[in-house]
């Protein structure tokens, strides 16, 4: 049953996108998919890239309570995280497991496989940039680049 509430409304029902660990592709910024550099020289920066048939674009969503999840890159086991200071542009990176709110993400379901991903520690939203190297950052939920689509690997 569709909700009559606007997606950004505080009344939006927060539904869990994944009830148990599940591997998905996360599509954002047009025909681009969430991916990450796997070397320290690039700070394990998260980016979006065109479709690749490999597990660097596969992410394990694990529910840790309510609609809060950890998001783990399948290819290397590192967890989605983000810098929380503006001098680092709130860049999204992957890091080893830290068991803190910088690695916990609230999934706000809009239905039809579309949702927003909000970092629990600071309330900023995962955002796919469409310029430069297609870097992923966190920011306010004020544009379409914070809408993601979940798909099967």
Question: How should each PLM-predicted stretch be described?
Answer:
Residues 2-153:
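Lectin-like carbohydrate-binding module/patch detector with strong preference for beta-trefoil
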């Amino acid at each position: 049953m569709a909700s009559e509430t606007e997606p950004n409304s505080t009344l939006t029902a927060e539904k869990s996108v994944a009830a148990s660990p599940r591997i998905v592709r996360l599509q954002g910024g047009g025909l681009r998919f969430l991916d990450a550099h796997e070397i320290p020289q690039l700070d394990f920066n998260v980016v979006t890239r065109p479709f690749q048939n490999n597990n660097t674009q596969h992410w394990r969503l694990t529910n840790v309570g309510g609609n809060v999840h950890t998001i783990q890159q399948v290819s290397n086991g590192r967890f989605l995280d983000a810098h929380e200071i503006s001098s680092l542009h709130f860049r999204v990176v992957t890091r080893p497991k830290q068991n803190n709110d910088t690695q916990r993400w609230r999934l706000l379901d809009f239905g039809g496989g579309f949702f927003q991903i909000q970092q629990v520690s600071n309330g900023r939203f995962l955002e796919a940039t469409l310029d430069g190297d297609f870097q992923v950052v966190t920011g306010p939920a004020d544009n379409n680049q914070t809408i993601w689509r979940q798909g099967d690997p």
